[in-house]
Amino acid sequence: MKKFLSLLVCLMLTLGLIGCASGSDDKSADTDKKESSDEATNDELKGHLVIYTSEPQDLVTEMLEDFVSKNPGVTYELYRSGTGDVKTKLSTELDAGGTDANVLWFADLGYMYDLDDQGLIYHYSPESAKDLPDTYKYNDGMGHEVRAIYSVLAYNTTQIDKAPKDWDDVTTDDYKGSLAIANPAYSGGAMTTLSVHVEPDNESTVGWDWYQKLADNDVKMEQSNGTLLTKVASGEYKGAVIVDYLPRNSKNEGSPIDYVYPESGSVLIPTPLCLMDNMS
């Protein structure tokens, strides 16, 4: 149990847990990751990990491959899909008697709390999490935030001359038939955005009226944020409601895309990393 726990904690560090820590920088993060990897190698960690995630396939695979290259006694299986699909798979397995998943990393904090209420989440707080703001730590070790991502407004810079400033700006004729959102049934980010937007007394609330305005303006729906990024960058859509790191990375790579954090408030998308309580 302790040996496998140390393996999982090292994986949590590799996946960037310390990246949310206040006052941390790239240099210190790299140092801490190196130290954790060295410890893992020195301890000759061995085991098989099963990870369920909604994070981008290439991102997670790169992290995992880096981890196992430093720990050759470790193997892994990765299931990656949209949050909705991941939850369906996990729930089906649990209903059938159990799951092999050890690590959960997807965008549905409420679902993680439900699992925790059933006694299915292993509570543990690694030393590296001590400097994390409380905002990024959940239920006394139930889970920790790996990174902070937000739902924002992205637009194609060759088609939009004046950047939107707030949510209502994309309900105008400029975006008629050319604004898209992700499917909340598939995308955890889209579901979180919808939930926050219609929650009473929330500072980021825009209400159902905003979604009705989108519908009246012939809003489009795609399955995932990744598809939104591709179609905004190509010019098929003028804009999209999307998670911020995708247009940021695309912009940095030279794509004709930019993004804004709405003035009335962007939506934080919790994507906690949790450990299933099935270690042996």
Predicted regions mapped to residue ranges:
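Bacterial lipoprotein signal-peptidase II cleavage site
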Residues: 18-35
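Short, well-structured alpha-helical segments in soluble
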Residues: 89-96
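A ligand-binding cleft/hinge motif common to bilobed small-molecule-binding domains
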Residues: 110-114, 233, 238-256
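Extracytoplasmic ligand-binding site segments that recognize negatively charged/polar headgroups
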Residues: 53-61, 83-84, 99-236
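Periplasmic-binding protein-like
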Residues: 149, 211-214, 221, 253-277
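Sec-dependent N-terminal signal peptides of Gram-positive bacterial secreted proteins and lipoproteins
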Residues: 2-23
